[in-house]
Swiss-Prot record:
Its main location: membrane. PANTHER family: ATP SYNTHASE SUBUNIT B, ATP SYNTHASE SUBUNIT B', CHLOROPLASTIC. CDD domains: ATP-synt_Fo_b. It comes from Malacoplasma penetrans (strain HF-2). F-type ATPases have 2 components, F(1) - the catalytic core - and F(0) - the membrane proton channel. F(1) has five subunits: alpha(3), beta(3), gamma(1), delta(1), epsilon(1). F(0) has three main subunits: a(1), b(2) and c(10-14). The alpha and beta chains form an alternating ring which encloses part of the gamma chain. F(1) is attached to F(0) by a central stalk formed by the gamma and epsilon chains, while a peripheral stalk is formed by the delta and b chains. It holds the Pfam family ATP-synt_B. The keyword Nucleotide-binding does not apply. It is found in: Cell membrane. Keywords: ATP synthesis, Cell membrane, CF(0), Hydrogen ion transport, Ion transport, Membrane, Transmembrane, Transmembrane helix, Transport. The lineage of its organism: Bacteria, Bacillati, Mycoplasmatota, Mycoplasmoidales, Mycoplasmoidaceae. The chain crosses the membrane at residues 28-48. F(1)F(0) ATP synthase produces ATP from ADP in the presence of a proton or sodium gradient. F-type ATPases consist of two structural domains, F(1) containing the extramembraneous catalytic core and F(0) containing the membrane proton channel, linked together by a central stalk and a peripheral stalk. During catalysis, ATP synthesis in the catalytic domain of F(1) is coupled via a rotary mechanism of the central stalk subunits to proton translocation. This is ATP synthase subunit b.
């Protein structure tokens, strides 16, 4: 209980320490002249703050705003310029791709033409070589035919000479013909080996 009494005593002592309303007003505004002096000094202080602090701050803020606006306009201009340059570079890239495609296409066409020319020249040379080979073969065949005819005519003359020089009976006729055939076969084999 004693604690409750102590609390009440402290509350009562606080109330007595707080001055009443009239005392507060008298302490703040002891008289009207002091109040007027305070108001005038407050107005002077406000004017001084406006003159010395607000106006330079306001002009600094305006200058800073103008600077920011100028930089934003420059950034927008630079962005427009970069977009324009990007568009131009894309167009140039597309033109380069088209030019490269044309160059490749022309190169392929030129390669195809060159290939056809080379094939035509090769076919022409092959045809020429073939005709030369064919003519050489024909020439060799003609030579062989001439040799064969000469051999046959020589053989025929020899045979005729043998027949005319000898008395021919049937058995000797067969023997002479066999000798001539064997001789002719040997000569043909030797001439084919020479080739």
């Amino acid at each position: 209980m004693e604690t409750i009494n102590n609390v009440f005593d402290s509350v009562i002592s606080l109330q007595s320490a707080i001055p009443d309303n009239s005392q507060i007003i008298n302490q703040i505004f002891p008289n009207v002249y002091v109040l007027i002096a305070h108001v005038i000094s407050l107005i002077f202080l406000l004017l001084l703050v406006i003159r010395l602090a607000w106006k330079p701050t306001k002009s600094y803020i305006e200058a800073r705003t103008k600077e920011i606006q100028r930089k934003m306009e420059a950034a927008e201009k630079a962005q427009l310029e970069s977009e324009k340059n990007l568009h131009i570079s894309r167009i140039k890239l597309l033109e380069s791709k088209n030019t490269a495609a044309e160059i490749i296409e022309n190169a392929e066409l030129d390669a195809e033409k060159t290939k056809k020319k080379i094939e035509a020249v090769a076919l022409n040379k092959a045809s020429q070589i073939e005709s030369e080979g064919y003519s050489k073969i024909k020439k060799q065949e003609l030579e062989l035919e001439k040799r064969k005819n000469l051999e046959v005519s020589k053989l025929a003359l020899e045979t005729a000479g043998i027949f005319l020089s000898k008395k021919i009976d049937e058995e000797e006729n067969k023997k002479i013909i066999d000798d001539i055939v064997n001789d002719l076969t040997a000569k043909l084999e030797s001439s084919s080996k020479e080739k």
